[in-house]
């Protein structure tokens, strides 16, 4: 079935608390999507973030980001008093440093009220999430006690989970552990309310999970035997990408690599649990770097570049079969961008999952024809660009004149109309699903770029300051109906 949606990170929503939250503005965005006759709201990973602020480097593969908790909703639920809700601040880019300094004290007031007389909803939540929640809360409490040091720099007894050290920590840090559990309860209570509302409005939430966990994560700390470590929770090999025309030294991501034989011996139980959790909070799940299941680039830990790595065979079809067994065959989007071998393409075909198409990549005048829309297949998801691309207006301003000319010739438009023409090309193409970034519908320039890969500084900070009008929603709806992507009218 043909359908469409909009890519909009939660942190990019407007709102009064310095970052997008799960409050009124998120519900208003659902209303906008419904009026625009959309089916999907695609977001970025929603886990807690640390140094660098990347949602793809989270402290947990299961937890939610405390920054997204809406204070107004906490007040409505009785966990904050009205005068404890901070005064509104103007909508600007996300200041993660300010959030780091200001949020914990406010959330602690709410947590203290909850913990003074825990509700049945809270105890039920803790019981349902016990497969990750206790370890995550203890990890975060220990991390604070260690001055926010990374896991690799913790004392040996704590890093390696020596039983006596953990038992003492659970007593010593009991209040902090309870705080982190309460915060997760607040997050998932608000998330559940938003998802319920979205689904009632006919909007499905498309989540995003990184293939790898962070080297500073409760996941690695809790189950180091599932990763390529030395037995002391130090990494032996790390993830990345090999050198190519765009990066002479490759990309050194530094994430832990999975010990796939161990996962296979356990029938991929950890991954099944991860994916079942993801499919419980999202309607559709995009898996980042899907090709890494077929083979992955392995770099010796301690290397300063990715140049010394090598490709290693992954679980391939065994993983796909395990996911089919646990989840069925739908509800997954495979991010299959980058270096694809015939083996990767065979694995993707066997999975039945749709891959991704990026319209901006179609118009490389040096390699004409490779990624043009006529090459797309129905079982795919097409984007003008993703969070890793500049906006289409930004692309028009920064791409080579030859590329812009090529795009305009193909799309039969002038440079001034290129963004709208590229959106129309996405909506009209054969791909079953089309996702357009919100910034492209607004014709915003490079200032609205979400992330520039392999850089630090101003990523993950863009927020929406342009009003989403009924006029824009009706324009989107008109094109959605025109290209037969609108849901059936009730």
Task: Give the positions of each predicted feature.
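Outer-envelope exported proteins of Gram-negative bacteria
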Residues: 44, 204-206, 210, 284, ...
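Conserved, well-ordered alpha-helix/loop/beta-strand core segments that scaffold catalytic motifs
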Residues: 180-213
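Catalytic domains of carbohydrate-active enzymes, especially glycoside hydrolases
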Residues: 24-49, 277-282
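Alpha-amylase-like alpha-glycosidases and glucanotransferases acting on alpha-linked glucans and related
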Residues: 9, 53-184, 188, 213-435, ...
């Amino acid at each position: 079935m043909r359908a469409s949606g909009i890519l909009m990170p939660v942190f990019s929503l407007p709102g009064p608390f310095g970052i997008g939250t799960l409050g009124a503005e998120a519900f208003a965005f659902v209303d906008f999507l419904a009026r625009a006759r959309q089916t999907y709201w695609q977001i970025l990973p929603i886990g807690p973030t640390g140094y660098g602020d990347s949602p793809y480097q989270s402290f947990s593969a299961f937890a939610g980001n405390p920054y997204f908790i809406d204070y107004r909703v906490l007040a409505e639920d009785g966990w904050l008093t009205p005068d404890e809700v901070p005064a509104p601040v103007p909508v600007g880019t996300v200041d993660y440093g300010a959030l780091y300094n200001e949020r914990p004290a406010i959330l602690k007031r709410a947590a203290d009220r909850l913990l003074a007389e825990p509700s049945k909803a809270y105890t039920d939540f803790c019981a349902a999430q016990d497969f990750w929640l206790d370890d995550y809360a203890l990890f975060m409490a220990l991390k604070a006690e260690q001055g926010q040091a990374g896991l690799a720099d913790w004392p040996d007894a704590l890093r390696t989970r020596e039983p006596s050290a953990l038992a003492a920590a659970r007593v010593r840090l009991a209040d902090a552990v309870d705080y982190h559990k309460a915060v997760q309860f607040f997050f998932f209570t608000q998330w559940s309310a938003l998802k319920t509302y979205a689904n009632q409005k006919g909007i499905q939430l498309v989540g995003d999970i990184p293939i790898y966990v962070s080297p500073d994560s409760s996941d690695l700390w809790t189950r180091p035997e599932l990763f390529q470590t030395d037995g002391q929770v130090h990494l032996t090999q790390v993830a990345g990408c090999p050198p190519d025309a765009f990066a002479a030294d490759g990309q050194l991501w530094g994430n832990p690599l999975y010990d796939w034989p161990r996962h296979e011996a356990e029938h991929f139980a950890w991954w099944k649990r991860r994916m079942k959790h993801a499919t419980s909070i999202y309607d559709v799940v995009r898996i980042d770097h899907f090709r890494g299941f077929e083979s992955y680039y392995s770099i010796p830990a301690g290397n300063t570049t990715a140049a010394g790595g090598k490709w290693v065979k992954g679980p391939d079809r065994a993983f796909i079969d395990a996911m089919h067994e646990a989840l069925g065959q739908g509800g997954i989007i495979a991010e299959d961008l980058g270096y694809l071998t015939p083996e990767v393409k065979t694995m993707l075909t066997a999975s039945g999952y749709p891959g991704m198409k990026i319209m901006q990549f179609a118009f490389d005048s040096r390699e004409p024809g490779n990624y043009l829309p006529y090459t797309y297949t129905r079982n795919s998801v097409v984007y003008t660009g993703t969070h890793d691309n500049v906006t289409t207006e930004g692309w028009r301003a920064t791409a080579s004149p030859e590329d812009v000319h090529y795009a305009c010739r193909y799309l039969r438009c002038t440079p001034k109309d290129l963004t709208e023409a590229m959106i129309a090309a996405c909506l009209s193409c054969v791909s079953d699903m089309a996702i357009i970034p919100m910034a492209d519908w607004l014709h915003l320039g490079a200032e609205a770029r979400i992330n520039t890969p392999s850089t630090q500084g101003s990523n993950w900070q863009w927020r929406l300051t342009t009003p989403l009008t009924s006029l824009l929603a009706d324009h989107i709806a008109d094109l959605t109906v025109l290209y037969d992507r609108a849901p059936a009218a009730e």
